[in-house]
Amino acid sequence: MQNLTISIIQSDLVWEDVAANLKAFTKKIKAVKQSDLIVLPETFSTAFSMNSEHLAEPMNGKTMTWMATMAKEKNTVLAGSAILRENDHIFNRFIWMRPDGSFDKYDKRHLFRMGDEHNHFTAGSERLIVELKGWKICPQICYDLRFPVWSRNKKQEYDLLLYIANWPEVRIPAWEKLLYARAIENQCYVAGVNRIGIDGNGVNCSGNSMLIDSKGDLIWKAKDLEEETKTVKVSLDDLNGFRKKFPVGMDADEFEVI
């Protein structure tokens, strides 16, 4: 089984300024050495703004074009979410952009009502699992982290659970505990990619991006309140070996979501 090289970019975001954010991420991405997957935070081109009618881009707009260009240039998968419009709906949409310009998408399922997100975006209804180098990867977005049924992995449908976020510093204890819980209960690697900095509403995000293995052991954690890019290699053999040795999924409860 092949190892997977993941590059996590923990960055500040410029409020509602697509050009400034894409310029900053271009520099950061170009500095990454060879990597299979580069991951950006939630709403990386605008920050977490509810000004969705003004900020929403079409699927062939500036952010999507930029993602395709960068993925091709670096010969890597580039992932992150943006405010995108399709069929008269606006989504907080995760994009999995491949070097050949093809992509998959996942629309944030759980919209953060305490920030009024549910009144400015359309919720997604389908989970996404993508494949890369023999790995199966399930991307989710920020508030999705609080809902374990949505990430349930009883049949080992995926190997890496990927969360991108604009998670505030005041709730970082929950962020960290929930990331560990998702890794342990789903017997998978979990990567949490968060932004830093103060947004346009005065909310401070401290980062605390993390990579955790299926046993609940910390592989890497970013520095608080600092921009950082980290490239880490993870092993599918290690994951499968632990799953075989400790098959807790065989005793998991059955239930149906209606």
Enumerate the predicted regions with their spans:
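CN hydrolase (nitrilase-like) catalytic-core segments centered on the catalytic cysteine
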Residues: K62-V77, R146-T229
